């Protein structure tokens, strides 16, 4: 999910029947980061899907702070109660900002967070995160 002209957009990165691979990671890296994503709203829309599918891992990419951190933290707790491991990748313009974003995401309740400042590094970071679980 991301926002385009204040609309929440959904992107299909990996079909359900396909294993995660480099092609999926590259598709993920092509989603434009433009900030302003109402993460709690996105998670609320995902809630029925995640409840029914109960994936092992739910990966969030973020380029900043959620608009409602308390609601996001509550949703993360809810997803974790389903047995879903919540992981986040903070994307920043440089190493320092990426690290700050990743640290802030950790405070929301994500079990694992990483920072990345170069878009070309996203596929490897995603594969590293998913491979370590």
Predicted features by range, described:
Residues 1-133:
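Acidic, glycine-rich A-domain
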């Amino acid at each position: 999910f991301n926002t385009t002209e204040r609309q929440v957009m959904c992107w299909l990165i990996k079909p359900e029947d396909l294993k995660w691979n480099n092609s999926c990671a590259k598709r993920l890296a092509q989603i434009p980061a433009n900030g302003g994503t109402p993460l709690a709203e996105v998670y609320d829309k995902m809630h029925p899907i995640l409840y029914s599918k109960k994936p092992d891992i739910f990966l969030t990419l973020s380029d900043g702070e959620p608009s409602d951190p308390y609601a996001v933290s509550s949703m993360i707790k809810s997803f974790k109660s389903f047995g879903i491991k919540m992981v986040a990748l903070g994307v920043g313009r440089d190493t320092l900002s990426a690290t700050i974003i990743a640290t802030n995401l950790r405070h929301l309740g994500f079990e694992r967070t990483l920072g990345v400042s170069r878009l070309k590094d996203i596929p490897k970071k995603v594969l590293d995160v998913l491979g370590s679980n």
